[in-house]
Amino acid sequence: MEKFEGYSEKQKSRQQYFVYPLLFQEYIYAFAHDYGLNGSEPVEIVSWNNKKFSSLLVKRLIIRMYQQNFLDNSVNHPNQDRLLDYKIFFYSEFYSQILSEGFAIVVEIPFSLRELSCPKEKEIPKFQNLRSIHSIFPFLEDKFLHLDYLSHIEIPYPIHLEILVQLLQYRIQDVPSLHLLRFFLNYYSNWNSFITSMKSILFFQKENKRLVKFLYNSYVSEYEFFLLFLRKQSSCLPLAYSGTFLERIHFSRKMEHFGIMYPGFSRKTLWFFMDPLIHYVRYQGKAILASKGSFFLKKKWKCYLINFWQYYFFFWTQPRRIHINQLANSCFDFMGYLSSVPKSPLLVRNQMLENSFLIDTRMKKFDTIVPATLLIGYLSKAQFCTGSGHPISKPIWTDLSDWDILDRFGRICRNLFHYYSGSSKKRTLYRLKYILRLSCARTLARKHKSTVRTFMQRLGSAFLEEFFTEEEQVFSLMFTKTTLFSFSGSHTERIWYLDIIGINDLVNPLN
């Protein structure tokens, strides 16, 4: 615990000061407006309350901020809500929205400077490829040979709003900025309630998207802070001894063999060298923690997490938020995939001089499968097929042109193949493709008052093939000259597209 407090104080020492004066600079609000227009993520509202950005309005805002001590009134007299008083032109919701976006830009600056000015800590180069913290795709491709249990964690949310301000206080000691943040939270939610209501949270998220993202990321970073600390503590010491080996898996095998050959070797000393192998990934407000050890050790981890949340965030956490499953028997939903960690046999032939050996190794790796029942249910709900998967026509689309009908069906099919290209078994995707193609043909035949057979004989099957081309075929044309890997007919190779993380409706690909 003393090491954790020392590590925490070291991080807190990198606090930044005086970000509040930046709110009086006009370019901050122009930058916030440009970010909303040119941001990497799509936004629904391109201007504040459907009003165009005006430098004149921003200048009026800054002048009135100089003239009136609105921050002092908002803190000392929170019931008056002077900043958002509609009777006064300055205290309007429009100016509050401008301040919210500008504040979100300003408060991110210290965190960006900390990343740029933070000195690089001493690292072992050979260990970089073994870390899987905060990275979804390396986590999915990792080998879990020495791991035994998976802990599914639901990150607690929402929490008391004052705790969000206190978490930022560890990183920023600018008191006026913290008071301004309290003011925004006080206006958009019920400050007297211990747990914020979901209705106020949804409204606050809609009106202050950038600020909400910043607050949530700050909260999650503090939540993950102790996990990163334990990761460094558990990995730093063994690295001095395992750094000479090519992979940690070989080091673990050699240490186990060393304990068998030398029974007098202290078990405590053996554990001193072994790495606990903590694998962690976060997604959609949830987290997965895979580690080595007994079930009793995992129960202690669960109690530790609950006590940590109660001590650090000052609220009671329900134990059902953490589920512990054995790695070999766990099957769960992960980003829209049906995931499990089965044991797959791997035969390796070892040739030593004139002797040949066959080594049977059991590998444990993430297996991602397309949820066929769930997706067919979505197609049935959207009236593409029946509940049993039998294709039907889409009557509501018969008023569209042939090109629009083909484009809509083809886009849905390509989106399915794009998102679920990371599946190790793609036969379900081909079944969904068959449903969509036949549903498209029946929709076109119904529009032209014909049968599917007559319609296909008149136009040919190639008429639909152009619009239902999987992206794997495109990759096969790109890599035919550079690699021996074949995409055509491959049902086990996985292709991960990085943009699927930014998809909001991960489970429902039809939106």
From Swiss-Prot:
One GO molecular-function entry: RNA binding
UniProt keyword terms in alphabetical order: Chloroplast, mRNA processing, Plastid, RNA-binding, tRNA processing
GO cellular component term, pick one: chloroplast
Pfam family, one: MatK_N
Superkingdom in the source lineage: Eukaryota
Main location: plastid
Compartments, as annotated in UniProt: Plastid, Chloroplast
A GO BP entry: RNA splicing
Role this protein plays: Usually encoded in the trnK tRNA gene intron. Probably assists in splicing its own and other chloroplast group II introns.
Family the entry assigns: Belongs to the intron maturase 2 family. MatK subfamily.
Name assigned to this protein: Maturase K
Gene symbol of the encoding locus: matK
